[in-house]
């Protein structure tokens, strides 16, 4: 346990969202005058900030999921996912097979990571405080969103706490919270976009007729547009370039460019990848067998006395079967026809998840050269637990069905040397990240915005995982991320002629303004959310991070890196240890 002082609590309260904190305050406002009676565990900085405005201090959840807990949970995750891989398989008429199981595991693993973390925190907290009464907020009705992730209306902490309290014979009180299950504005907007996209797709299919050898990319995310532009300028005029997936606005601009002087560097050749398609009778029969095996497996899942199989069973029947299995079938059907029609000579992608996983598998089945250009960092793992997480993550980014994989950094090369690889490595140097920074005159003005030329600038950049994309051990939770910032601000405030820039992207609704309210008052730091990261990296003297692609961005540009991990939980790369013990500075 990270928190070592042990005190008995009369009331132990678990809160995850602001609406839960609000209804809790309304119910217990008078009793909260005796603050010592209540210990509140916050699962999100927004809750902590909201309570602070009412003069109430909450304890962050991550304190009750220490290193040993993360390691244990990764072993449980590995056991569960391997049960699926060993016992469940599904193949369609195009030959696509691995994508069904891997796409499902990708979604299930994220869901399980959140649930297991919450179970671990609630269990450890109850054992630590030995409360007389546990309080949590239960949403009504229980709602399963049509989403392959866990949505904000899908809340399970009250059920978790209730099961644990029942087993330990502790009084449990739940507060009912009415939650609107449908956002009609979003539904209408989504429906209109789908309709307009269909019209746009049909128009493009008619007017597009690439006459040259075609190179396609799955998306332009993570800098893939730069890769396409580089290719266009470096290879002969015998090739044309196109993207399968573009956001609606970008797709519209791309098409308009065909009729104006603003001709885009790459074309837009969409695929009807999300259009529903009924499976053939053989596939439907195989899918039913697959689903029965899967449900039998997950119904047996229980962790620390909490039944999680029933939740996942419901999630699968209501959502994952249609949104993962059926959509993977649709991707396979439509992408197979797409590849047959356009006959690309090369397929590129920055990741291999969902439709891009099917694209990679089909490319290999059809003997179309394909290359994975990983959008994220991969480094050699130095312990068996972080290795479990990295190897699983690699299946969608660097160890994929694509025939080739671009090796962009020496650390990626070292990582690949230690795994059984599906792809052929090609040393390309930096493509999506780690490129040499061009120091422009504008950067001088950016630096002077924060500090004088004689001052030292420290840049903090991290990649915490939001609630719907939970990951264990190798990434910070969002409350742990903010806690680290607090410590950095306190440390830098004691230094002369040093300024800390917190490079922050809004996550899970936590705005820069709310974040500032959680940080100490100091003139020694600034929060930067706008502009290109490369510009900020070019003005920094030292990068500070937990685990992020920004680490390799800095190292590739000869900028020193400080791995900052207060609780010594994870070491992203080997370095010189500056401070040992609990500080976790490397």
Predicted regions and their residues:
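Catalytic-core helical/loop segments in enzymes performing group transfer/polymerization on anionic/lipid-linked
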Residues: 1-586
């Amino acid at each position: 346990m990270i928190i070592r002082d042990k005190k008995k609590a009369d009331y132990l309260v678990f809160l995850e969202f602001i609406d839960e904190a609000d209804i809790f305050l309304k119910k217990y406002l008078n009793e909260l005058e005796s603050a010592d009676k209540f210990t509140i565990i916050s699962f999100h900085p927004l809750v902590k900030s909201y309570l602070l405005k009412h003069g109430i201090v909450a304890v962050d959840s991550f304190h009750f999921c220490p290193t040993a807990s993360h390691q244990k949970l990764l072993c449980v995750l590995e056991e569960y996912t391997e049960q699926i891989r060993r016992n469940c398989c599904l193949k369609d008429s195009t030959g696509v097979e691995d994508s069904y199981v891997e796409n499902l595991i990708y979604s299930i693993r994220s869901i399980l990571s959140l649930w297991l973390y919450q179970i671990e925190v609630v269990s450890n907290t109850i054992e630590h405080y030995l409360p007389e009464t546990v309080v949590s907020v239960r949403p009504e009705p229980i709602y399963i969103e049509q989403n392959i992730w866990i949505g904000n209306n899908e809340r399970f902490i009250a059920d978790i706490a209730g099961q644990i309290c029942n087993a330990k014979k502790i009084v449990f009180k739940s507060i009912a919270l009415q939650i609107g299950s449908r956002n009609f504005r979003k539904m209408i907007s989504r429906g209109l976009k789908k309709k307009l996209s269909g019209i746009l797709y049909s128009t493009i299919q008619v007017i597009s007729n690439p006459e040259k050898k075609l190179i396609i990319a799955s998306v332009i995310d993570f800098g893939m547009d730069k890769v396409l532009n580089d290719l266009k300028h470096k290879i002969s005029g015998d090739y044309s370039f196109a993207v399968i997936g573009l956001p609606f606005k970008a797709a519209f601009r791309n098409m308009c460019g065909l009729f104006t002087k603003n001709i885009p560097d790459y074309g837009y050749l969409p695929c009807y990848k999300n259009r529903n398609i009924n499976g053939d009778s053989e596939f439907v029969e195989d899918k039913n067998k697959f689903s029965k095996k899967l449900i039998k497996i997950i119904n047996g899942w229980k962790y620390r006395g909490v039944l999680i199989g029933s939740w996942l069973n419901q999630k699968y029947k209501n959502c994952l079967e249609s949104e993962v299995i059926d959509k993977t079938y649709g991707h396979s059907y439509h992408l197979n026809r797409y590849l047959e029609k356009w006959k690309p000579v090369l397929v590129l992608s920055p990741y291999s998840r969902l439709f891009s996983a099917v694209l990679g598998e089909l490319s290999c089945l059809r003997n179309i050269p394909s290359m994975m250009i990983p959008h994220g960092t991969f480094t050699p793992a130095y312990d068996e637990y972080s290795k479990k997480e990295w190897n699983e993550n690699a299946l969608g980014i660097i160890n994929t069905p694509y025939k080739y994989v671009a090796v962009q950094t020496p650390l990626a090369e070292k990582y690949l040397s230690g795994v059984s690889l599906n792809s052929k490595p090609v040393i390309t140097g930096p493509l999506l990240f780690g490129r040499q920074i061009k120091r422009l005159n504008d950067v001088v003005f950016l630096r002077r915005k924060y500090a004088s030329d004689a001052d030292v600038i420290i840049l903090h950049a991290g990649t915490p995982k939001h609630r719907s994309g939970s990951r264990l051990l190798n990434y910070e939770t969002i409350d742990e991320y903010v806690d680290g910032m607090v410590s950095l601000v306190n440390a830098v405030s004691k230094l002369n002629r040093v300024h800390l820039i917190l490079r922050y992207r809004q996550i899970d609704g936590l705005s820069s303004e709310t974040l500032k309210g959680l940080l100490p008052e100091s003139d020694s730091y600034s929060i930067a959310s706008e502009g290109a990261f490369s510009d900020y990296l070019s003005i920094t003297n030292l990068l500070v991070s937990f685990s992020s692609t920004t680490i390799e961005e800095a190292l590739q540009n000869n900028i020193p890196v400080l791995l900052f991990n207060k609780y010594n939980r994870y070491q992203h790369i080997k370095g010189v240890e500056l401070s040992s013990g609990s500080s976790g500075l490397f």
